[in-house]
Amino acid sequence: MAYNGRDQEYGGHALQDLPAGSSQYHLPPQENDEEQGRGLLNSGYEQDRLGARTPPDRPVSAYSLTESYAPGASSAMPGQGPTGYGDTGGSFGQFGNLDANAPFPRPDSAFDPEDSWVERQQQPQMGGGGGLGRSKTRKIKLVQGSVLSIDYPVPSAIKNAVQPQYRDAESGTEEFHKMRYTAATCDPNDFTLKNGYDLRPRMYNRHTELLIAITYYNEDKVLLARTLHHTMQNIRDIVNLKKSTFWNKGGPAWQKIVVCLVFDGIDKADKNTLDVLATVGVYQDGVIKKDVDGKETVAHIFEYTSQLSVTPNQQLIRPTNEGSQNLPPVQMIFCLKQKNTKKINSHRWLFNAFGRILNPEVCILLDAGTKPSPRSLLALWEGFYNDKDLGGACGEIHAMLGKGGKKLFNPLVAVQNFEYKISNILDKPLESSFGYVSVLPGAFSAYRFRAIMGRPLEQYFHGDHTLSKMLGKKGIDGMNIFKKNMFLAEDRILCFELVAKAGQKWHLSYIKAAKGETDVPEGAAEFISQRRRWLNGSFAATLYSLMHFGRMYKSGHNIIRMFFLHIQLIYTTLNTMFAWFSLGSYWLTTSVIMDLVGKPNATSGVHAWPFGDTGTPIVNALLQYLYLAFVMLQFILALGNRPKGSKFTYIASFMVFGLIQGYILVLSAYLVVRAFDTPIGDQISFASTDAFLNSFFGGSSAGGVILVALITIYGLNFIASFMYLDPWHMFHSFPYYLVLMSTYINILMVYAFNNWHDVSWGTKGSDKAEALPSAHVTKGEKNEVVVEEVEKEQEDIDSQFEQTVRRALAPFKEEEEVEKADVEDGYKSFRTGLVVCWLFGNILLIVCITSTNFDNLGWGEPATERKAHYFQFLLYATAVLSLVRFFGFLWFLGRTGIMCCFSRN
C-alpha cells in the first residue's frame, strides 16, 4: 500500500482515532507456550523433495525438522542410542537409527563443535569429482556495477516449514525460498536506492509500520534467542488481533513489521549465535565476502522471512497446525558489521541506512538479552497510535531474578532490582507527566522515525567515531572530554534533542503496560564498570540539557507544556546539586548520627548507646576513621586500578561500607524510639498554625524532623509501591538497598569521577575477516560487471544445514570467564598496596598520638602528654640520626686523607 511517512496519518487512519489511555484491540486468550511439551517438530515434509533428478549414488540426507535435540523433547524416537545432546539419553533423531548398512553413516566426529567458523566460510573449489567439487558456477551481475546482491536457496527443511497459506500467497516472490545477501561496501549514509542498495520489504512494495531493532555485541546464543524468540511471540500478538482499526487493513499485519538484527563486528560475535540465525534461515555459512573487487565490505546484510524460532533453552519452534499459537512469518534483516564500531554506529545503520529505505512509522530498540513480555511491543506501538505528538516512549525494565528469585540472594542484584523498580514507580511517571523523560533506555525503548529525523539524529551521530574525520571538530575526535563523556549516555542526548526540536511539539512518555526483563551485573567489578559509564554519561548529559534549555523556546510546545518543563528544570537542577555534594552529605550524616547517639549528656541524663558511655565514643571514632580510610582507598583504587584487577578489594569495600551503614540504621532506629518516648503532643503544639509550624520544624525535640524523614524516605516508597500493585521489592530488595546505599556514592561515584578521562572509542579490526573469501570481479558476455561463484546443490545445502542445527540446538554450556590479570594489573596492585600501607600507617600514627578517645580507657598518658613525648622522641631521634651522619662523615674524611698518603701513582 502506498504510504507517506511524513503525513500525520497512518495511510488514512488518523493517529487519534483511539482514545488515549485505552485500547480497542481485542486480543484472543493466549495460552502459555509449553516449550518442552509441545509437539514442536512433528510434521514431516515431502520425502521426494530432492526431486527425481537426484543422482542415485548421492547419499540422501535423513535429516528433517521433525527431530528435536533438546532434553525432554516429545519428538524423540524410541530405541535411540546414548549419544545425544540430551541429559536423558536421547539421540540425534533419525541419525540414532542408522545401522551398519546405512548408505551414509555419520560418526560423532563429523559434528565436531570445535569446527572452525572461518573454515566454513571458504568457497568450495570448482572442479570435477564427487561431493561439493562437482558444483556448478554462476555469474552474478553487480547492481550498477558495484553492489553485490545475491539470492541463495535456503535449506529444504526451512523452506518446507513455512505454512502453505503463506507460501502460496507469496508464490510470485522468492521470499520463502531464497535468502538474500548484500555486501555493503559503503558508509551507512550511502546505503541508498540511488547507489543501488535496496531491501526486500520495499522491493515488494510493503509499508513498514514497525521496525524492531535488536543490537548485539558479544552475547551468547541463549541471550540472543531470548530476545529474538520473545520478539517473534510479540509479533504473533499483533498478527492475532481480531478487531483493529489498523493492523487488519491494507494487507497482512506481518508484512508491516520488520525485525532488524545488527551485530557489532565479526570478531566479537559469539559464533554459536550465527548457528541459531542459520537455523532460523536468516544466515548461511560460506556466503559472506570480505571485499568486492578490492573494496572492503563494511556490513554483510542478510534478508529472509521465517516462521522458525529457537527458544532460550534450545528448542526449535515451527508451525505444527493451523492454530493461533503458530508464529507468523517474520521479515528479518540481519546486518553483520565487519568491524566493531560501537553501538552508535549500529544505530546509524538502523536509522540512516535501513530506516530511510523502509521509512517506518515506529522504531523499537532492544538490546540482545532483553526479554520483552507478552504484548509489550504492541503496548509501545499503541502509545504512538493513540498520541500523534508522541515522539518517543519506553517501557518498564526490571531485573531478571532467576528461577524462584534465587538471584535476590546476591545483594548487588537485589539493590539493582530495587533501583529499577523505584525508577519505574516514581521517577519515570514523574518525568512522563512533564513530557520529557530524561532517558529512554536503549535496551527497551521506541521512537517515531519522522520525529528523530533531522537534528536529533545528527547530534546523536556526532558520537560515531567512524564520522570523526568527516565531522572534524564536531566529531568525537574534536570534542573535549566533557562532550565525550556526554556520549557515554547517548540516549539522553537523543531524548533532549527530540523534545527541543525546533518548531515541533514532540514529547516523551513512559508506558506502564510495556515490560521487559534484562540481566544485571552480578559481580562488583562488572557493576562498577557499568555504573562508571552511566554516571559520567548521565551527569554530562544532564548538564548539557540544563545549559541548552533555552532551545526549548524554539520548539512548538504550548504554554502549559513549557510551564511544566520549567518545573522539571528546577527539579533537575536541585537533584544535580544534591548529587554533587552527596559525598560530603553522607559523611556528615554518618558522623552526626553517631554523635547524637554516642555522646553522653550529663545535663539531660542521656547516656551513650549501645556500648555505654565509655565504649560507644571509642567504637564510633574507630568506625569514623574506618569510613574515611575506605573513602580514601576508593580514590587510590579509582586513580589507577581496573575494577577487575582489584576485585577482592572492592568486595571488601562494599562489605565495610555496608557494615557501617547497617550500624547507622540501628542507631537511627534507636533515635526514633528515643524521640517518641516523649508523647507527640508534648513535642508538637497544636494550639495554632504558627505554634504547630514552630514546634514541628524548629522545636528542641526531633519529633517533627523524624516524622518527615520516616514519611518521605520509607512511607512514600511503600505507599507508591502498593498503589502501583507491585510492592514485593519493598520486602526482599529494600533492606539490601538501605544497607548498601552509601556505596553508590562512596564507591561508584568516586570511581566514576576519578575516571572521567576514560572514554573508550576507536574501531577494532577484524582478524577473522582477513581470512574470509573475496568477491573477484570479471567482465561478462555483454561487458557487464559480474562475480563468479560456486552454485551449491540443494543436497549440499541440506547436508550442511544438518550440522548447523546440531550446533544451534546443542545444550548451552556457560563457560566461566577466568579473569587473568595482566602484567600491568600486577604492577598497579603492588602500587596500590604500597600507597595504602604508607597512607594508612601514617593515619594510624596520627590517631594513636592525637585522639582523645583513648583517654577514658586509661590506656597510658593523656593525649596532650602523648603529643609532648612524641615531639621529644622526634627531637632525640633526629639528633641521634644527625650524629650518626656526622660520625660517618668524619670517618670518611679521615679515611680518605690517610689513604691519600699511601696511594700509588
From Swiss-Prot:
Compositional bias (Gly residues): 81-93
Protein name per Swiss-Prot or TrEMBL: Chitin synthase 3B
InterPro entries (UniProt xref): Chitin_synth, Chitin_synth_fun, Chitin_synth_N, Nucleotide-diphossugar_trans
Glycan attachment residues as annotated in the record: 536, 601
Induction: Exhibits lower expression levels in hyphae than in germinating conidia. Exhibits the highest expression levels during colonization of wheat.
Localisation per UniProt entry: Cell membrane
GO (cellular component) term, any one: plasma membrane
Membrane-spanning segments: 562-584, 618-638, 653-673, 705-725, 733-753, 832-852, 873-893
Principal subcellular localisation of the protein: membrane
Region (Disordered): 1-136
Membrane topology reported for the UniProt record: Multi-pass membrane protein
Family: Belongs to the chitin synthase family. Class III subfamily.
Lineage of producing organism: Eukaryota, Fungi, Dikarya, Ascomycota, Pezizomycotina
Listed GO MF terms: chitin synthase activity
